[in-house]
C-alpha cells in the first residue's frame, strides 16, 4: 500500500533532458505560438500528476522571480494573470502597481523535482503593462522582440544564454544567520581549479552539473 497521499510528477534526469530538448527543438523550428499553447494546455490538463505551474520572469537586473499557481486555477485564468509590479525594484510605483503576465508557452520547461519540488512544471511569462502592451522594463521581452524583428527583417537568428557565476558560502542556511555573524564564510578560498574530489566545493559542482 503506497504511503504517499498524492502521486506527484517526479521525472528522472534522463527523461527531463529528453522533454526539454524536444521543447527546444520546437523553439528552434519556430512552431506557431497558438499551436504550442494548445499542446501545453492539453498536456497540463491530461497530466494528473502535475499540481502547480511555476511562472517565471526577470527584473531589470536579471534577477529571476517565480510565482506558483495551482494548475486548475492557471488552466482557467491563463489569460488573466496579474502581479504587483511595485514589489519589483525598478518596475512600477505603488499607485500604478498592477502588471500582467502573458505566458510564453515556447519557454515551457520540466524542472528537477529535487530542486523545484514534485508535481511542478515551469513556464516563463512576458510582462505586460495594464493596457496589455509590452512592459518596457521587461528586458527579456525586449530581447525577444529584438530577436523576432531581426529574424523577420534580415533572416538573422540571435542566440543568447546565461553564464552562471557566483559564490558558494558555507552552510545551507548561511543567509539566515548573517544578521548575527555579519559575514559569509566561503566554502573554499582556493577556487574551483584547486578543489579536490570530495571537498564541499567539488561536491557542490558535481551535484549541480
PLM region spans:
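ATP/Mg2+-dependent ligation/transfer catalytic cores
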Residues: 1-209
